[in-house]
């Protein structure tokens, strides 16, 4: 994928790219009559607005309306960068507030198509405080259980990024777009420009995907139906994959089978379970764990299920935070959650500690414990201590025959107890880590499969 900007689109051009044909209808929103040269009586402000209106054909820096995207109806907020750099002023705030209010009244998701340099200088602090208005509308929309899926274009900087962009539930970005809180004219002279791009924000966990303009309609058409289909019914646990070898005979047999490279991993389970799925990426705190935690939403038997799945590696702090983000989003939207447990344990290297491993695991424990939406868990491999338990649903966890769950790895337990290596296998039996042991102990509900 190219990392060069794909060209700037006007507000109506970007609407035409994402909306189903002939479905966009502009909202009949009223805005305040401006004072001469604005609230600060800024010399030449009226003339600047008049030139912007003549050049773009718009009366303000946003165009708001409804449309269908992939058949799903949504409120669209399209920024016109040609109108004073897509900046936010008082009248912009009026339009944004009215659009969000309409979305809540009609139970519609909001899709901001953002391209802005930030707050409008000619309106001073009154422009800056529009960010508080926008944040309030976003918060009310969250409380209403409605999704917000942002598309950040070139450029998206300042308060527009810090509210409508980064504050959305899901963030898509155009390739090569300038994206960041600091715009090009205010960042340090020696700053690396590559850090202020869509691709850099993806790597930093602030963007979920980089999508080419011609693919936006399809991408949004996958996201919106999934995020607007609540269900109070728990997700059923997946059927087991792989051979039917029966339950393990010993604790060490359970460990050996769970660690086998031939055992199906999370990606195989997700592919078998979902008709189609879309992934979220990143913890919104500067990190990602794409090799350790898979998170997103998919369709299972005609309804949406959210998923957070460990891949069999040591889970990084960013992975736990991404899973917590996923569960809280699903909870707000009323979507059931499926988690797949498979890790030898949380990453325990020095870098993981610096990244806040303990706090990240604690956050996931709380997200699962506090979820009102039903959470179903399946242990598909290694259940390594608290790093695995954090993802498991209390009272609704199941296990495959190729799995185990333990307070600690048998080798480490033997070492702590100062037992010789030959005692590792008996220690595994003593720990009672087999799936059938876990059922008998009341740790899990049952096993899946024959």
PLM regions: where:
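Intrinsically disordered, low-complexity segments enriched in small/flexible residues
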Residues: 1-69, 73, 217-305, 309-312, ...
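A structural preference for short, pocket-lining loop segments at secondary-structure junctions
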Residues: 67, 71-80, 95-120, 297-311, ...
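Conserved mixed alpha/beta catalytic, RNA-binding, or beta-rich assembly cores of soluble enzyme
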Residues: 81, 89-92, 96, 130
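A structural preference for long, well-packed, hydrophobic secondary-structure segments
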Residues: 142-143, 310-337, 355, 366-373, ...
């Amino acid at each position: 994928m190219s990392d060069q900007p794909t060209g700037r689109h006007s507000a109506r051009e970007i609407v035409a790219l994402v909306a189903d044909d002939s479905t966009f209808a502009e909202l009949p929103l009223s805005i305040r009559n401006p004072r001469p040269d604005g609230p600060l009586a800024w010399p030449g402000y009226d003339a600047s607005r008049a030139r912007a209106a003549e050049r773009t054909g718009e009366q303000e820096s946003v165009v708001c309306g409804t449309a269908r995207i992939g058949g799903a109806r949504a409120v669209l907020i399209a920024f016109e960068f040609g109108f004073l750099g897509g900046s936010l002023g008082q009248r912009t705030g009026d339009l944004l507030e009215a659009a969000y209010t309409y979305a809540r009244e009609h139970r519609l998701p909001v899709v901001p198509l953002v391209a802005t340099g930030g707050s409008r200088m000619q309106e001073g602090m009154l422009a800056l405080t529009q960010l508080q208005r926008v944040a309030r509308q976003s918060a009310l929309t969250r409380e209403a259980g409605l999704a917000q899926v942002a598309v950040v274009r070139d450029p998206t900087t300042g308060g527009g990024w810090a509210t409508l962009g980064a504050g959305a539930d899901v963030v898509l970005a155009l390739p090569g777009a300038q994206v960041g809180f600091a715009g090009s004219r205010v960042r340090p002279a020696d700053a690396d420009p590559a850090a202020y791009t869509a691709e850099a924000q993806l790597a930093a966990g602030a963007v979920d995907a980089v999508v080419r303009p011609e693919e936006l309609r399809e991408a949004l058409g996958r996201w919106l139906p999934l995020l607007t289909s609540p269900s109070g019914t728990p997700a059923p646990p997946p059927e087991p994959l792989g051979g039917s070898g029966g339950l393990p005979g010993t604790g060490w047999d359970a460990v050996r089978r769970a660690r086998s490279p031939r055992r199906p991993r999370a990606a195989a389970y997700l592919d078998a379970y979902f008709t189609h799925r879309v992934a979220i990426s990143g913890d919104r705190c500067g990190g990602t764990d794409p090799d350790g935690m898979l998170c997103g939403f998919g369709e299972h038997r005609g309804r949406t299920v959210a998923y957070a799945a460990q891949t069999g590696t040591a889970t990084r702090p960013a992975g736990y935070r991404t899973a917590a983000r996923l569960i809280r989003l699903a909870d707000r939207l009323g979507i059931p959650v499926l988690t797949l447990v498979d890790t030898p344990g949380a990453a325990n290297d020095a870098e993981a500690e610096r990244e806040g491993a303990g706090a990240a695991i604690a956050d996931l424990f709380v997200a699962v414990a506090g979820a009102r939406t039903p959470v179903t868990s399946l242990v598909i491999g290694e259940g390594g201590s608290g790093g695995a338990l954090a993802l498991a649903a209390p009272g609704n966890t199941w296990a495959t025959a190729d799995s185990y769950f333990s307070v600690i790895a048998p080798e480490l337990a033997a070492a702590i107890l100062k037992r010789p290596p030959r005692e590792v296998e008996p220690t595994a039996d003593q720990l009672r880590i087999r799936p059938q042991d876990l059922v008998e102990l009341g740790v899990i509900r049952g096993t899946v499969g024959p």
